[in-house]
Regions:
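A hydrolase-biased, glycine/serine/histidine/acidic-enriched motif that marks catalytic-domain neighborhoods
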Residues: 1-265
């Protein structure tokens, strides 16, 4: 499995998941350009995918292989699987963990989702206000306003954190501009929970561009932010094991390319 991290490029987001996979399941995190000193973030999803594809081909030229992606990294993983498949590589499946459909990140979609969320929260706060003593209502409203007031971003002086911030910003800009084409492989969608099917993220739309799709979901209450953390990692590791059982086992022993980092167990 070759896995694209989220928008910040942190391959160790997969660490807890990998710890619950079988020891004979190869799993490599793909580190994007821009995190290492002297490297520059790539500015399009297509270029990011080409960068990873070149590294994978140097390591495992034809496959079989699985491609995975988490959150916004799912968009890059989709394009990576698409490019590899189009070039003749044996991509047995694409696994997307809590990956919103790429157009869900566009400004109008984001604002619409925020409006729906705030409308729901307004009802909740109105009910709360009715239960708060009159003498405390002004304080409650002031606290809510402080939370909603945007804060000025702090200046980042640490060069490592500054590079990560540039990768985050560049990746999100690229994802918002991406338009997916057809992908000739099977898709396994890992949803944080079943209700995510109907969320702002529209994750099942990825299936419109693949040859087949299977959908799996974690427990209700799980969110994309925590699905790969230790509390839920065993659940999703078991689902990965389930989908990988149908696939041919990959050979091991080749040298690792520079951009491919094995997630620590």
């Amino acid at each position: 499995i070759f896995a694209v991290a989220g928008h910040n490029g942190d391959v160790f987001a997969y660490r807890a998941l990998v710890q619950h996979l079988a020891p004979d399941q190869p799993f490599f995190g793909l580190q994007p350009a821009g995190l290492e000193e002297g490297s520059v973030p790539l500015t399009s999803v297509e270029d990011m995918a080409r960068y990873f594809a070149a590294q994978i081909r140097a390591f495992r030229p034809t496959g079989p292989m699985s491609i995975a992606g988490y959150c916004a990294g799912g968009t890059v993983a989709f394009e990576l699987a698409r490019q590899l498949t189009a070039a003749g590589a044996d991509v047995t499946n694409l696994i997307l963990f809590g990956a919103p459909y790429c157009t869900s990140y566009r400004p109008l979609r984001v604002r619409a989702a925020q409006a729906r969320y705030l409308a729901g929260r307004s009802v909740t706060h109105a009910r709360t206000l009715l239960q708060v003593p009159a003498s405390e209502r002004r304080r409650y409203l002031a606290a809510r306003l402080r939370r909603l007031t945007p804060r000025r971003a702090a200046q980042i002086s640490d060069p490592v954190l500054a590079r990560r911030q540039r990768v985050e910003e560049t990746t999100m800009a690229a994802v918002r501009e991406y338009t997916p084409g057809p992908c000739g492989c099977h898709l396994d969608v890992m949803l944080p929970c079943s209700s995510w099917r109907r969320s702002w993220a529209r994750p099942l739309r990825w299936g419109r561009s693949t040859v087949s799709t299977a959908v799996f979901a974690g427990p209700e209450g799980c969110t994309g932010d925590v699905m790969l953390l230790p509390g839920h990692a065993p659940t999703f590791a078991a689902l990965v094991t389930e989908v990988q059982r149908r696939l041919p086992r990959p050979a091991t022993g080749a040298a690792r390319p520079s951009a491919v980092r094995r997630a620590a167990r």
